[in-house]
Amino acid sequence: MWYFLRDTLYSIVFIGVGMRTSGKLWIGKSAGEVIQGENSFDIIRYFLSFAVLVGHFRVITGIPYYFPMSSVDAVHGFFILSGFLVFYSYMRNPDIRHYTERRTRRILPPYVFIVTLCWMGGVLVSTLPVGEYLFSAQLWKYIAANYSFLNFIEPALPGCFQGEAVNGSLWTMKVEILLYITVPIVYYLMKKYRPFPVFIVIFIFSTLYNELFYYLNEKTGNEIFGILKRQVGGQLLYFYSGTLVLLCFDYFRRYIKFLFPVAVLVCYFRYDVPLLIYVEPLAFAVVLIGCAYYIKWFVFMRKFGNVAYGIYLFHFPVIQFSIWLGINEKSHILCFAFCVVGTLLLSVLSWLLLEKPILSNRVFSSK
């Protein structure tokens, strides 16, 4: 235990002092080996995506399906993985143009696809006549709001799904984009002022942000404060917890056998033991990235395209469509199977026909 505490203290001091070699921000040497080599990030993405799918299926249909992780935790998990992988990607090539192009190619095509599919498909499920639907002010408000990632302005389509949100998963996209925007800024600040003080400022700010809007929500009962709590200020904790593990990866790898069970206990008892909730983001990052590092059974999945992003984007409207068809009234199991198969089918088609060609530079190439 003494050696662990000693070396952990050394690692904190090491990061606090900072290390600049050839003008590059320091990173754990083994992090690159794990990211580019054998890891199970793909299966973790699938697990998180299905956690969100099951969570939304349960809420929308009222059918009590169980999954070992809540949709809220799954969203936090996605932010952690982004903080680890996206920050690493930027550190390898800190060119703004390259970074922007890579992020745009990854997130924009399937997003535009599902928004377009929803408002065009709305013609078929809307209770309004086609002409009234197409010239509805609500439709054009939906189109403008959703193409600009401001989904909260108009989440519903005219006459569709009894006025409920068409795709309740899209709210995280604007948060994800804003987190991406912070990466070059934080990278610059870490190079200038060293990582440790920058992490401290980020974690303190995000914690205070969460506490403020949690208090206001509890005090006033106004849900707007709960919504604000979930925005980018509150998610910085999770995103940069992933980044912190990245920068400390050599130490993380050395002490994973001790850190992992401690992190699991922190996550499990976070609501029961005071103060644990404040270190839960970092503990969750240790658990997720530890699983990616240690679980080798699913390494083979790296050979195939990952459609987890598609599952996340497409499942919500598929669930709404299944309700519109009335499948849930006939069989809960059939309804769930329809949602899973329909979501997977859309995700695979999107990957093969849209995402993969764009990512491989076969379309929209800048060359």
Task: Name the predicted role of every residue range.
Residues 11-14, 18-20, 36-91, 108-111, ...:
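Functionally critical transmembrane alpha-helices in membrane proteins and complexes, commonly lining
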Residues 50-58, 202-215, 262-273, 314-321:
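Aromatic-anchored segments of alpha-helical transmembrane domains
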Residues 2-11, 36-39, 64-75, 161-175, ...:
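Interfacial loop-to-helix transition and helix-capping segments at the boundaries
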Residues 112-175, 284-287, 291:
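Membrane-interface helix-loop-helix regions
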Residues 20-27, 71-106, 110-133, 318, ...:
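Juxtamembrane transmembrane-helix termini
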Residues 177-206, 246-258, 328-332:
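Solvent-exposed interhelical
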Residues 3-18, 264-356:
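Alpha-helical transmembrane segments of multi-pass integral membrane proteins
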Residues 1-2, 17-37:
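Short, Lys/Arg-rich, polar N-terminal cytosolic tail immediately upstream
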